[in-house]
Amino acid sequence: TESMKELVESLLFLARHDKKTLMMEMVRFDAYDVAAEVQREAAMVTPEDTFALEPADHVQIEADRGMLKQVMRILCDNAVKYSPKGSTITLGVQKTESGCTLSMSDHGPGIPKEELSRIFERFYRCDSARKTESSGHGLGLSIARIIVMGHSGQLRVRSKVGAGTTFYVDLPLTQDKVRHGGEVNLPPEKKHRYRLRSKKDKSGYAEAKVS
């Protein structure tokens, strides 16, 4: 089945990473193009939903294009899984002072504050996910985390129960550790720090980030 295929591919990715045989190929490209591709493909697969792209900045970055697209697909797939049919899912590309921020927003059930710091763990599925019929093995966000951290980036999440979730991928414009067009092993996982706000903001949203 498609679910089993996805599980096998995810486990192979993690196995190659753990054995330090997973390579990144750094190339320069427009981050907007990757987001637009994910938007178009998602619209074809799930025509009942609306996929918007806003903000839509054109930002030249240096990264592994395939892996960055994989991150966006993981975030988009999750948004589709946990949102009501007919929802609007918004992808974003924004140029920042220090680089580029990619985002994915949904109107799903939201993630409880106490679970935000665990969603990037392997095989972890939050309580709201376990109560739905959505498929998933709890590996997607851990893979996204590995890829983002391998690019010296940061992965953030902002969520409110009943209002939806937004993921942010903050990336530098260049990768100092490898020359353009070169290959490099995806770095091994470090003991990442999960930072969770002790209080929700005025709008009731809680945030967490891994760095």
Protein language model features and the residues they cover:
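Short conserved segment of the HATPase_c
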Residues: 111-123
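Conserved glycine-rich
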Residues: 152-153
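Conserved catalytic submotifs in the C-terminal HATPase_c
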Residues: 25-28, 48-60
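Short helix-loop "hinge" at the ATP-lid/N-box region of the Bergerat-fold HATPase_c
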Residues: 79-80
